[in-house]
Amino acid sequence: MADRQLSSASSSRRQKQPTDGAVGQFVIDKEIGKGSFAQVYSGRHKVTGALVAIKSVELSRLNKKLKENLYGEIKILKTLRHPHIVALHDCVESATHINLIMEYCELGDLSLFIKKREKLITHSATRDIARRYPIEHNQGLHEVITRHFLKQLASALKFLREGNFVHRDVKPQNLLLLPSPLFRETHHSAKQILSASYDSLMPAAGLPSLPMLKLADFGFARVLPSTSLAETLCGSPLYMAPEILRYERYDAKADLWSVGTVLYEMATGRPPFRAGNHVELLRKIEAAEDQVKFPRESVVSPELKSLVRALLKRNPVERISFADFFNHTVITGPIPNLHEDDLPKPEPQQVKETVRPEGSLSLSRRDSQRGKAATGVLSSPRPRPSSPLATPIEKPNPLEQVPGPRAGLSYSPAGDGLGITRRPAVQPSTSAPARPVMYVDRSRANSTASQRPPRESIVPDPSQTLASQPRPKSRPTKPLTEEEKAAQDVALERDYIFIDKKGVEVNALADQISMYPQSVPKSGQIVRRATQQGHPTSTTGAVSARNNHLRQGSYDKPLSSSPGSTTSAISKAIQDASLRLFGFNVAPHLLSKGQSPPQIYSPFPAYPTPSAPAGLISDGKHTTPVDEDSRVAQCIEDWATRSDVVYGFAEVKYKQLVPLAPSMDYGLGGVPADKMEEEDGLTLEATVSLSEEALVLYVKALSLLAKSMDIASLWWTRKSRSDNSNSIHSAARDSVNSQALALKINRVVQWIRSRFNEVLEKAEIVRLKLIEAQKQLPEDHPSHPSNHQTEVSSVTGAEGVILSPGISAEKLMYDRAVEMSRTAAINEIASEDLPGCEIFYSTAIRMLEAVLDSDDDHLPKRRISTSSRDEKAEAAVREDTSEMSSEDKQSIQKMIQMVKARLANLQKKMLAISRAQQQQQQDIISVRRRSGEMAPRSVPV
């Protein structure tokens, strides 16, 4: 639902939220739209945080007829469960308001989509669509998109006709849009939406890569058998059937006229008939005499034109029937001119069907729908156990369906409707992040994994039994390595869902801390039911889930494919820069053992309840909790500041690649077209180089942010434990200073969460851009994928990223720090821009500290069990591959101390200058006062 500003003429009572910030089990956020008699707010579930739309109607403003329409809408929506109809979750009535809790549709309505069709490239959820199906100037939507939406609208209308419903107000404003299922399941930035049933977010028709359409606003809908006629004037005049405008009796075919007007507007970008009132509109319809003309500039296929003309017949008898409409080739046939990414991929469905257990009918229906959605064919009905939450696929009478008492609040934890996802092959870690192979609603997992209700509380569904049943093999696969087999065996032991683990940890921890100190946690641990340890697989943080007892046996290899040359290049650069700036050489083997990117945000520490303070957080002295909180806050801020410095450096690269960074500030529009062409000036080699540099820097920033969250996790665990115990520090814990520090930590954690999610998205954009640019290089180019078949083949089931030799975050950061220090030194000598010099020195220090980053710097040193060879080997490998030698650290630390000395001298110099200026100003003021005392005064002192 598109955001709209409140009218200045609206009364304060209309602008006021219906309750004190909550309606039933939902919290009201902000107003996102309004109608003649209702306001629409975005809201979220108190427990899961899933988004909903809350339609709040003030009863005092409704007359008897409008109240009947409202209660009729509620009655109808309670009985309807279809993927392409906006579902009603709940209805909460108070003394002054009726609040309808409905599905949230992030992309607004179809009218906004059509209006902003030339600016879809600026929205993250529609950017890929605009690239695959570009829209020419002064034309409507691309025909592929038009047919896709028409198929989904037809699916909703077919369901309504089976229940003898007529909507009577089909128009673009009542057709709401969600991001495509593929976008929701592969992008962490997608918002988590509360689903009404297991398949309410799974399209029944169309393409899974395009936005999902849902029919809304049943205020004028009614049950109307095919033999009955109605005579009420309702709906929007611009899309009304002529028989309604003539005040004649009408039947369900009135909806077909409205479908024709919507289809015409999608194809051309404008409605077929424009008028200021319904009388003038009727006159224009009559004058056209069924001759529907299309603009010359619009490219519309003859098949689509024929369907529009069949729908826009003045006489309902001559108008196409529902049966013919639902069986029309545009509805039932495949969508032509599909992009290669949307072409249907053949799957051995018959083999799967023959071995599928009987209890998995709902899953086979889902697979069937997905397979047919690519070709645009409606799914064929399959018998299955009836459920009040399920989409009726037989011919039901909706009025006879009685939903359960809380049926509207059914929630699918998996994100794509069934609560079950296909388990991906376990992927070994690689030199660069790889694309996740999970098909999961990652946004949903991000904020609800730690708060997911027990499985026993979920409404029983036949598909749930699949989680524990062995899955038959559908086709032969290549042999797995021993490590992959072991990882898969352990993964199959758990009845959990594969999720973006690190993103979940960051968001879940931030959610937990955000509730403090408003409510004291009831447990000493952070609940992480659906999160496991695993290997990093992509810059977006997706990881393969595995049991906690399965230790990681391999480590990320350095990004360079030729370690010798890389070390030489880095060492030479460091020595030359150090000699120029500081007059001494750094050890030649500096950073030779470092990783870039490091082991990406190594799995969240396997110490949910540590028994001792973390090494970095505690100095071994016995101090009060307040002092400890102060150290924690400072430590978290330090790591966050280092990540911010690296992020700023990565942004320099990113903005050269994407001149206008994706931003929700622009919504679906607002980006000048000329700015979108700036990236065309980059050569392929430059694009590859910038993408590689931006990628490793973003990954480095992510690792630093993850360390901040690790420290916050330890603090939060200890804080939660102390809150549930009668410790001697209970008084200090409740002190004002302690609460203030906790709030400070909370603010920092929320900032880290926001930055973490932003960097994940940008890293994925850069990764895709890098892969695309590498494919366009000449085949003999060293960076072309064909020259790295060995490396790429090691990434199971994912598209690997191969970086050029010599690319590492540490080298880039070191060179940048040296450059900034040198520039600051030159300006300091010339006494130019001293505040800028201070910023440059501080940034260089933070960047060099980030170069010194070690995965275990901030973590407690855990003992190595003498009875576990694996743990000993793991510790040895970590010490050999992840940590710098003491000589390397001393060299960098010496450099940091020298830059700090320069910074201290600069600050003293700036302080002296400031004091001199203040003294000079005071002297001037005193002179003026003395001169003023000698002048005659008109007012006595």
UniProtKB/Swiss-Prot annotation:
Q: Which reaction does it catalyse?
A: L-seryl-[protein] + ATP = O-phospho-L-seryl-[protein] + ADP + H(+); L-threonyl-[protein] + ATP = O-phospho-L-threonyl-[protein] + ADP + H(+)
What Gene3D superfamilies does its record include?
Transferase(Phosphotransferase) domain 1
Give me the stretches of Polar residues compositional bias: 530-551
UniProt keyword list: ATP-binding, Autophagy, Cytoplasm, Kinase, Membrane, Nucleotide-binding, Protein transport, Serine/threonine-protein kinase, Transferase, Transport
Cellular component per GO, a single term: cytosol
Question: What's a Pfam family in this record?
Answer: ATG1-like_MIT1
Q: Which residues bind ATP?
A: I32, G33, K34, G35, S36, F37, A38, Q39, V40, K55
Q: What class of enzyme is it?
A: transferase
Q: Where is this region: Disordered?
A: 1-21, 334-487, 524-568, 861-889
Q: What is its EC number?
A: 2.7.11.1
Say yes or no: keyword Repeat present: no
Q: Which stretches does UniProt call biased (Basic and acidic residues)?
A: 868-889
Q: Biased composition, Low complexity: where in the chain? A: 1-12
Per the record, the domain of life is Eukaryota
Q: List, alphabetically, the InterPro entries matched.
A: Atg1-like, ATG1-like_MIT2, Atg1-like_tMIT, Kinase-like_dom_sf, Prot_kinase_dom, Protein_kinase_ATP_BS, Ser/Thr_kinase_AS
- Membrane-spanning residues: none
Q: Where is the Protein kinase domain?
A: 26-331
Under the subunit heading, UniProt states: Homodimer. Forms a ternary complex with ATG13 and ATG17.
What's this protein's function?
Serine/threonine protein kinase involved in the cytoplasm to vacuole transport (Cvt) and found to be essential in autophagy, where it is required for the formation of autophagosomes. Involved in the clearance of protein aggregates which cannot be efficiently cleared by the proteasome. Required for selective autophagic degradation of the nucleus (nucleophagy) as well as for mitophagy which contributes to regulate mitochondrial quantity and quality by eliminating the mitochondria to a basal level to fulfill cellular energy requirements and preventing excess ROS production.
Q: Which protein, by its recorded name, is this?
A: Serine/threonine-protein kinase ATG1
